[in-house]
Amino acid sequence: MAKAKFERTKPHVNIGTIGHVDHGKTTLTAAITKVLALKGKAQFMAYDQIDKAPEERERGITINTAHVEYETDARHYAHVDCPGHADYVKNMITGAAQMDGAILVVSAADGPMPQTREHILLARQVNVPYIVVFLNKVDMVDDPELIELVEMEVRELLSKYGYPGDEVPIVKGSALKALESTSQDPNAPEYQCILELMDAVDKYIPTPQRDIDKPFLMPIEDVFSITGRGTVVTGRVERGTLKTGEEVEIVGFAPEPRKTVVTGIEMFRKVLDEAVAGDNVGCLLRGIQKNEVERGQVLAKPGTIKPHTKFKAQVYVLTKEEGGRHTPFFNGYRPQFYFRTTDVTGTITLPEGVEMCMPGDNVEMTVELISPIAIESGLRFAIREGGRTVGAGSVTTIIE
């Protein structure tokens, strides 16, 4: 059986379901595939297929995530759904599944619950830019005023965490009714809420800027000296494009970036005119000695990224079962922070009133590195100690 070819005809968007346990995230995910399958735009995935998601390892952390794909008339979607609450926390902080937008599922019968809040806060911290709400289980609420009340609560909660609560689309319905319906007609009344939701997702969550359209950045993995030609740095282009003859900055390990010109680009020993996001390339740098550039620095379009030493981050601390620490750590803890291609020592300051951090915790902290690194908001990192990963984090704010 030949593999189906991925046809890139529609814009692609990554989304996921978030929300409190038992509010219907997985039921909704299954219902979306069912209704879109009736329109010939998805393969139906039953609840059990999604719920028994295989374990994945991302940066040494075990995460259960279900990946589902489907299409609307407008776009192609990759949708992630996590069975357990801890899986969500890990998923969002490690960026195992980067989301361009999220569907927040809230039960109309219960209203917002603790994990509803936690997921909204996490989404904000790790830069999930847009949220669409599905108010589920409305068939279980007799009083329409109660539904209105829950809707107001959800809007207030979103506004509290920095989302435009008044503008966010809220679609009401019953995912279970849609999933259990026997109708083969995609326009049956019980499917309307699902079609309405996908229409809101199509319209409200913008197609993200592709990596190739962003400013050039390449983390340096290795440095070589080629006799008679100069210094070559190698790495995988993270974003943007680079043409021979363009000026770049070497950023990191020094207070100020250093400018140079890329005089040649090679891939698989062949000369390239242009490198694009995803390419593994070697770049020949003009006027740079081998000892003036090192792994852990980045090559970047001038003026687009600066070296920093101090930032705030949201961090998930691994449990001992995940290979993390067996004991808590305290204020002033000094592990290694692994950014892109290298480790840098840094000191942790916990928030006021927080004495220590236990394995399994999800915590906000301030970090001060001993040398400046090319950092920007949203950058992921691992916290390591003696070569093993003990935490995973995402930069939320740059301080200096």
UniProtKB/Swiss-Prot annotation:
Residues 174-176 are annotated as: G5. Residues 19-26 are annotated as: G1. It is an enzyme of class 3 (hydrolase). Mg(2+) binds at residue 26. The keyword Nucleotide-binding applies. Its EC number is 3.6.5.3. GO terms for cellular component: cytosol. It is found in: Cytoplasm. Keywords: Cytoplasm, Elongation factor, GTP-binding, Hydrolase, Magnesium, Metal-binding, Nucleotide-binding, Protein biosynthesis. Monomer. This is Elongation factor Tu. The gene is tuf.
